[in-house]
Each structure stands twice: as structure tokens, then as C-alpha cells.
Amino acid sequence: MSSSIPFYDKNAHTLCQQYNSVTFETVHKSWQAYWPLEGDKVLDIGAGSGRDALWMHKAGADVIAIEPSASLREQGSKYTGPSVTWIDDSLPSLSRTENLGMRFELILVSAVWMHLAPSHRERAFRKLSNLLAPNGKLVITLRHGEFQDSRQGYEVSVEELERLSKNSALLVRHVDDSQDRLNRNEVWWQTVVMTLPDDGSGDLNKVRHIIVNDNKSATYKLALLRTLLRIADAHSGAVIDRTDGKISLPVGLVALYWVRQFKRLIDIDIEGVGIQQNSNTSKGLGFVKDD
């Protein structure tokens, strides 16, 4: 992303005129069913001219606009006025945004993803998913078509977002293809809407946070957690006892799911070496004992 910022700084005035020549409703019509509601907290990443941020503010949302280009940020803040909060931040770090300690009902990443190097996208997506409120929506638009100027762009795909969504426990709700609204023949777009499910108690999101952000140093704990989640999803009636804020499950059921999910991994043997839990190849899995 940083390699393209000088272009946006140099051409901010022209680009803002170009972006503001089309309306939010026209550009984002494909995901109208997911537009923000009054009172929603919205994060607009790569806010550019402020067109989208201003529209969402007028719709009743509380909008924070993220823009790494100083010139675009200046132009955009003038366009929206003080009702929209502007922050100098960027993917994949979003460090200043994280420091706000906020969660958002909608995160819009419009015309940004193609600037991110593929090696940065997993981290960026994890940051975005962690900023979502329960039932929050993450909307990413994908630009297809090479730039004819000094901006840096990389290939993008819906399949990549589907994979990243699965890894971060998000659900893909909507995918749409559309022509370029600025009538550039060599450019076309896809829009992907993803959501963070919520069970109503907030516990699902706590568990999700552990799974997504665990450093994997204790793999058996993560494996057990995933096993319990599978049981909770498929066999809620298997609970033996629910008193004292705890539940009891048949150990045989836990063992069965554990074996079904992880026995094949334990059996892996590549040139005499099995799957490793430790950087020391002489050590096996910590939870596998001789007896």
C-alpha cells in the first residue's frame, strides 16, 4: 500500500473530483441489503475523498475514516466536515485504529485490497475480523484490471477472501460482480460481504478470538477446543449436566471426535519423522505418551 501513497498524494485533487462524480448509491448498490443502519459504528478504510464516509454519516452512522495519504485525508476531511473522524492509519497494521478499543458494525474496505501485497493479506484480514462487533459486516471490493499509472496493484480473488474468512470464522454472505462505474473498460469489480456470527451471549466470539489469535504453542489445547466446538455444534443434547455454570460431556464422545479429527495427523510419517509440535525434531507430540 505504501508504494502507491505518493501517487495519491500528488493527484489528490483530481482523484477526489473523479471519485465524487459518482454517488455512494451507484457504486455500492450491489450490497444495499447490508448498508449501515442508524447508530451503527462504521470503519471506512481507504476513505479517499470522503464520499462514502459522508453518505454513511448522513444515514445516521458513527463513521471513522482511515486514510494513509495526507493529501487525500486533507481533501476528504474538508468534504465531510468534523462529523466524520479521520485517522492516519493503514493496512495491514491498523495500529492507531486498534488503539481506539472499538468494535464496528460495518467495516468497508473499498478499492484498497488490490494495493496490499499477498504476503500482507492474512495479517490484514485478521486485524479486520478482530475489529468487528458481533454480527458485524466486513465489505471488501476487489478491483480487477491493471493500473495505467504508477500505482502498484496485485491480483485479487473471491477465493482468497473465502479462505481467509474461513480461517477467521467469518461467513461469506454475498458476492457480486459489477462493471466499473467510472466507465474504464479495462476495469471490473467484485464485492464480497462477510459477517461475524454471534450466538447472543458473546461466548462464541470469545472462543473465536482464542482460536484465531492463539500462538499455537500448545497445540493440544487448541485441538481440544476445536473438538469441543464440533460437539457443541452437532450434539448439544449430549450434555449430561449443566449445573454451577459448567457442563459435563461423555468422555467417549470427546475421544471419538478427537480421534476422527486428529488421528490422521498423528499418523503422518515423512521420511521417518512424524508431525512436529516442537522445533526440536527429536521431540514428538507432547500429549503422545509411550503408555
Predicted regions and their residues:
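Class I (Rossmann-like) S-adenosyl-L-methionine-dependent methyltransferase catalytic domain
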Residues: 1-39, 43, 48-99, 116-123, ...
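Domain-level detector for secreted/extracellular nuclease and nuclease-toxin modules, and
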Residues: 204-214
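Short catalytic micro-motifs in class I SAM-dependent methyltransferases
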Residues: 111-112
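Short, conserved loop/helix-junction motifs that constitute active-site signature segments
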Residues: 130-133
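Structural motif
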Residues: 214-223
